[in-house]
From Swiss-Prot:
The modification Phosphoserine is found at residue 105. It comes from Mus musculus. Transmembrane segments: none annotated. One of its GO terms (cellular component) is cytoplasm. This is Protein BEX1. Interacts with neurotrophin receptor p75NTR/NGFR. Interacts with OMP. The gene is Bex1. Belongs to the BEX family. GO terms for molecular function: metal ion binding; molecular function inhibitor activity.
Amino acid sequence: MESKDQGVKNLNMENDHQKKEEKEEKPQDTIRREPAVALTSEAGKNCAPRGGRRRFRVRQPIAHYRWDLMQRVGEPQGRMREENVQRFGGDVRQLMEKLRERQLSHSLRAVSTDPPHHDHHDEFCLMP
């Protein structure tokens, strides 16, 4: 009788131990709800592995990335960018005007019938 009682106690203890282990494993399973997905060649350009080496998960692409950047124009950094673009645009415009004036002055000097004055540094003559 005693051996049967001990056998029953041992079984009960083993069952209790297994139930405790199952309870400890359940919270970990609820934390890891995402299914493991293996990367394929069709994964796309926006996907990359994340996490440990054992599991490979596909990182979700950023859907509203460009929209978010466009909304940031109202922030101080965006306003600074707009001011810089305007300033640099004005500088480039001035440089282009100066370059155009110089090119026109040189071309007009070559076409004009006036005798050349004392700036011979840009003219070339092969006559002796």
